[in-house]
Amino acid sequence: MCNVKKLLLVILICLPALTFAQDVTNSKVVATLRFQIFDKYLIIPATVTNSIDTLHFIFDTGAEITTFNQETAKTLKLESKEMAGMSGTDDVVINVPISTISLLYLAKTRIPFVKVYLENLTQFKGSPVRIDGIIGVDLLKTFVVTIDYEHQVMQLYRAGKTPPEVKGKRMPLALNFKTPVIEAMISLPDGNTIANRYHFISGGEYGILFNWPFVEKYHLNTLLPITNTDKVQDLFKVLTYTNTTVPFLAMGAHRVEQVPASYSKDVDDASSITEVAGAIGYFVWKQFRSITINYNERELFLEK
């Protein structure tokens, strides 16, 4: 009995040290990736199990699934025995082959058994490097991610509590299905403001992309001045976007002036549970020195 008491005493004494050790471990950067920026997309290097060649993935927080270039899959002899549906901005679903990457290496760390949807990523042909895939949520679920725009590096910490050295002001994060969501407020030319929820999209080629039901509800197509229009090829068809400017966007303690915004009648990336106004993209996030995303703890840190 005496030995049991001694053992319990030792465990109680060691618990704070063990807890501290866990915190210290989580504070350690497990990988540092130097990224390139192409056409508002962040490109990070990676390797896979059966190849020594460096692959290049677009990192996009809005990517609920990981896509992989069909040409790269053929080169790596990545087999596919299943089909699954995926959709674009216009919500048209197409069936594509799927496969699994046994180990995806990111510098000195890795993600095991990454399910990938095989697609021809022809829209990135102008990139300085071949785009081999697009990854988002699979990376966010595995690591706490810091995007350092000032030095163009991405730092990865093991998933867990946000490391104490992370800089910036905290904002709560929510999820719409698997996509990160934040609260934000826009101003209108008449001085009125509208607060709502927005998808947090690191790779968006825009400042704000409004969902059409939100545009209709608040008459943004008449209240906001029209700059011009663009035609963009989506997965299945060409979409027409109307471009405008929002006087300012406020997110927590931060405010960004003169934000370019767009909308299209074909865009409605909304939630079935609560209203989502749209998405906030790269033009806004590049205004910050760094951004840290703790997907599992539902936290976002913005450093100006």
Feature roles, as predicted:
Residues M1-S27:
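Bacterial Sec-dependent N-terminal signal peptides
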Residues F20-K304:
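Pepsin/retropepsin-fold aspartyl endopeptidases
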